[in-house]
A protein has these predicted regions:
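Conserved catalytic breakage-reunion loop centered on the nucleophilic residue
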Residues: 1-195
Length: 195
């Protein structure tokens, strides 16, 4: 455990599987480099979000285009990656997968490790450490997204930007407009009463 801690603090990637959009370099398995195919998908996801698309609309678009989900992409590249999230024969893109990508600061070049730990080597159950105890190395590798775009996306994710099932884009004032009296966010309400 101490060895891993030292490697993490030196900016070495010690996880067996890296974030979608990156791969380990051939010369040093502890360093990350951009995977051109998956990296362009990540950049497209951020662009779609910046254009006002919801996570659900982004996931649907990626599925329509036949783009492999992170799980399927890893499998297609010979990885023995397993996950508990797979529910069907082929794992498709979901709004949860898209949101995880949009929130992951690995895409601005930051390596964040040591989020989980076990009480000791005999106990297999892990728990999430407080964020202050995570090891964060900023500007560790080449980013896929600019800091500015990442920050804008984080602000968008913090707003209520739900859309109706038949709508692809978020309303212009979603998550911004608030009630002048109580300060609650304004939401869309469908009326079924005629008149």
């Amino acid at each position: 455990m101490i060895n891993l801690e030292i490697k993490r603090k030196k900016g070495e990637c010690v996880t067996p599987f890296v974030a979608f959009g990156y791969r380990k370099t051939k010369t040093d398995k502890h360093k990350l480099e951009i995977d051109p195919s998956a990296g362009s998908v990540v950049q497209d996801i951020f662009k779609m979000k910046l254009q006002g698309m919801s996570q659900d609309a982004i996931a649907n678009r990626l599925n329509e285009l036949g783009i492999l989900s992170p799980f399927e992409y890893k499998i297609s590249n010979g990885s023995r990656y397993e996950t508990g999230f797979r529910q069907k024969e082929q794992a498709l893109w979901s709004s949860v997968t898209v949101r995880r990508i949009l929130e992951n600061e690995v895409y601005i070049g930051n390596l964040v490790q040591g989020k989980r730990t076990t009480p000791n080597h005999k106990v297999k159950q892990t728990y999430v450490k407080p964020e202050d105890d995570w090891i964060r190395i900023e500007k560790n590798h080449e980013p896929l997204v600019s800091d500015r775009d990442f920050e804008i996306v984080q602000r968008l994710l913090g707003m209520d930007t739900r859309t109706s099932p038949d709508q692809k884009q978020v309303y212009l004032l979603s998550g911004i407009a608030v009630c002048a009296d109580c300060g609650a966010p304004m939401t869309r309400k469908v009326s079924t009463v005629a008149g």
